[in-house]
């Protein structure tokens, strides 16, 4: 059976939560820190924003180059190979910085946010996505280079320690991701991902966002009939009821740069 890249339900929920967050935040330019294959950058470019994606994984940037080829060709988007922590202070100034499933890989998370803050204009916004709930630490965290998971209060505190204001933290994908959590772990275990436990944290991190795991990140092409934004719309409505709870195994933090 041939498998192709199709976003799983949790990714659709994450993307919809980002759309919800953007409704209250203006801006025309963005920086995607740890852009991976570029799927969230594409969402922002589709919405008319102009941006830059940064990642230290050459393989991830190859995928992002293909994903965002039309926007790259017309100058609406560009890619930068490298670690954001090594970029100069004058690298860019944008209205919005996003970073999804990156900060949990970084030892100094407050310093990470302060670095990103340098690239956001005063009055601009930062949106951070991280694995939620410490009690959900699992094999998957140990194979993709995670250092920690965040309870809702943890993420709120880190954003405030970075001297950001108008802080808000949402639980994302509840109950969809929660219900699929153990199934997802089973798929990870049977895929051979456990072999990555012998890799360095950086090696694990480089491939964390571009894994091909059958029935988790890749599916038979016919599954598009089920996994699409239209058919999954009821899940988006339901997740909004849980944004202000601490139940999410994915947390999204939003804050303003003073």
What are these regions (language model features)?
Residues 101-105:
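A short His-aromatic
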Residues 1-92, 96, 100, 244-255:
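Conserved N-terminal segment of class I S-adenosyl-L-methionine
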Residues 2-12, 39, 85, 107-115, ...:
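S-adenosyl-L-methionine-dependent methyltransferase catalytic module, highlighting the catalytic core
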